[in-house]
């Protein structure tokens, strides 16, 4: 390990332990029946099959033994969560989870590959730096407007689960990076198998939706469908959308909707759920109020509001400025919604959320953190 890597790791360990010393974690239901997993800062190991009788014991572990870059618990409940073999854990049931990433939306998937040793930046994702064959730093260019789109769909998932499927106790979490997790904490759905969970995800997302099965098409030359004022499920979803967006007159007893407009509506109502996550009954999920080691931001519960405006500062546990020494030359690098200029080897004062992010990525070296303050969580 180089001296700069050592100093950066010491800094990250210090701020993470200070943060967790304030006991911010949201305790999941029946923590003693959950598998706990940690991506350890000290040895960069991914440690699974941990179990703790209480959150107090978990705090003792992460404050004294292994500092978590990432901290997870299983969506599943087990009789013996610490057993290494999944088939011997004694599965009791699982929460229902949905995962949304903002890079799945049009115009939101731009990535830079930063080659530190080459002092070069490449558009797109590359596996190795061409000149040195070293591993590049992958830097997604995610804007707030993209995260806002993902939140909008997370809220839509919540409403569908409640209004169409009758489920309750649904929570929306910002992942701490670029997306959202929607969790259903309800014993009624614990025993759902993977195929049943996939069916729910497909119903919500409209993945591979066959219009003809639910909307009989009328006409030969000018094709259309009929929607009445008394609809349920997906048909009501379409009805509400076309009325809300003034696509049709909502005062009529029934709506004659051209097939082309129906197809456009279905496309707009499609939600890019990661169905693999929903199907996985042993999926790991980030602790509420834990730090996401990719960004330095908090995985945080969000109040479900139609008028919610995403603000990255609401998820940053640090305040103040940090002095860093950049390891690369770059002008106008987008970090969150800000653009910064970096000159290799020239000290620069950065806002803490930018500095922590760049430190986690290995793009800068920490020089002084005297002005850094941990916010009240």
Curated annotation (Swiss-Prot):
Top class in the EC scheme: transferase
EC number: 2.7.7.-
GO molecular function ontology, one term from the record: DNA-directed RNA polymerase activity
Catalytic residues in the record: 99, 101, 274
Superkingdom of the source species: Archaea
Transferase among keywords: yes
One GO CC term on file: DNA-directed RNA polymerase complex
UniProt xrefs under InterPro entries: DNA_primase_S (IPR002755), DNA_primase_ssu_euk/arc (IPR014052), DNA_primase_ssu_PriS (IPR023639)
Keywords from the named record: DNA replication, DNA-directed RNA polymerase, Magnesium, Manganese, Metal-binding, Nucleotidyltransferase, Primosome, Transcription, Transferase
GO biological process: DNA replication, synthesis of primer
Cofactor: Mg(2+); Mn(2+)
HAMAP family: DNA_primase_sml_arc (MF_00700)
PANTHER family in the record: DNA PRIMASE SMALL SUBUNIT
Assembly and oligomerization: Heterodimer of a small subunit (PriS) and a large subunit (PriL).
Function: Catalytic subunit of DNA primase, an RNA polymerase that catalyzes the synthesis of short RNA molecules used as primers for DNA polymerase during DNA replication. The small subunit contains the primase catalytic core and has DNA synthesis activity on its own. Binding to the large subunit stabilizes and modulates the activity, increasing the rate of DNA synthesis while decreasing the length of the DNA fragments, and conferring RNA synthesis capability. The DNA polymerase activity may enable DNA primase to also catalyze primer extension after primer synthesis. May also play a role in DNA repair.
Sequence similarity: Belongs to the eukaryotic-type primase small subunit family.
Protein name: DNA primase small subunit PriS
Species the sequence originates in: Staphylothermus marinus (strain ATCC 43588 / DSM 3639 / JCM 9404 / F1)
Gene name linked to the record: priS
